Amino acid sequence: MNPTSIVLIVIATVAVCLIIMQIYYIYENYDNIKEFNSTHSTLEYSKTINVFSLDRRIYDPNDHIYDVKQKWRCVNYKNNYVSVSVFGFKSNKDKNIKMFTTINDCINYTFSKSTHSDIYNPCILDDGFQNQDCIFLKSVI
């Protein structure tokens, strides 16, 4: 065997290995590929997706917080879901607690990068620790 044939055999072997790896990755992610295609099939011929999709692998407000009590989470409160942390509840501008009917709505609101909401902490008000909202907040933290 001359050096040229050895180089060609090595290149062919590497190419076959890469093809096998690609087939394996497609096999592993086939369900995700089908889900993505079904979600965006109506936009097949458009230039951009133009659909709000939230990828929490890229942005998570809890990524840079190391104290567990400060991390935002969604919990069940009065048959609805609310975003809580040690700082308080996520709220509307008029200091009403923002409530969601489903946990997915709460998660999408809490972990959306575009959401800049107010925070309402009922424990720093005049009635303070006697407030039902404050008692609940302390119980989940």
From Swiss-Prot:
Entry's localization field: Virion membrane
InterPro entries: Poxvirus_A28 (IPR007664)
Ranges facing Virion surface side: 22-141
UniProt KW keywords: Disulfide bond, Fusion of virus membrane with host membrane, Late protein, Membrane, Signal-anchor, Transmembrane, Transmembrane helix, Viral envelope protein, Viral penetration into host cytoplasm, Virion, Virus entry into host cell
Source organism phylogeny: Viruses, Varidnaviria, Bamfordvirae, Nucleocytoviricota, Pokkesviricetes
Full protein name: Envelope protein A28 homolog
Coiled coil start-end: none
Function comment: Envelope protein required for virus entry into host cell and for cell-cell fusion (syncytium formation).
Membrane topology: Single-pass type II membrane protein
Family: Belongs to the poxviridae A28 protein family.
Biological process terms in GO annotation: membrane fusion involved in viral entry into host cell; symbiont entry into host cell
Transmembrane segments: 1-21
Mod. after translation: Contains two intramolecular disulfide bonds. They are created by the viral disulfide bond formation pathway, a poxvirus-specific pathway that operates on the cytoplasmic side of the MV membranes.
Transmembrane listed as a keyword: yes
Listed GO CC annotations: membrane; viral envelope; virion membrane
Pfam families reported for this sequence: Pox_A28
